[in-house]
């Protein structure tokens, strides 16, 4: 019998490459349903559903986000996982990395008998003001 820790680890190890590959393409977003709860929330209600998150993922069609895990931790008792990630904004046409930054992300998980889903996401971005400014420009994020 697999431990809950190992199940969460396997789930998270599958999640990051799936996000990078499928979440930002309307044709493949549905593949992410296996990772996200329908009532997914981000950062204190900035996103309040899986569908709203999918819409947000499509707002930068010329840029592909690529996530690389640098460190992953799991707290099976609290049903949480956290990751130190390197994220790259990659120009889809040229493959050029337009921006690279670090972020810490905390994931609250819903754990059922047969599946695990991400229920809440909290993102803490690198504090470099130049990178934050470029991020806002690339993704047309209002100040």
Where do the PLM segments sit?
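Basic/polar N-terminal segments that are highly enriched at the extreme N-terminus
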Residues: 1-3, 142-143
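Short acidic-aromatic low-complexity motifs
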Residues: 2-35
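Hydrophobic alpha-helical core bundles mediating ligand binding, dimerization, or RNAP-core interactions
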Residues: 12-19, 36, 57, 83-87, ...
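Residues in soluble alpha-helical coiled-coils and helical-bundle/repeat scaffolds
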Residues: 20-23, 41, 112
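A solvent-exposed, acidic/Ser-Thr-rich amphipathic alpha-helical stretch
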Residues: 26-81
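A beta-strand edge to alpha-helix "cap/lid" segment located at domain peripheries
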Residues: 60-143
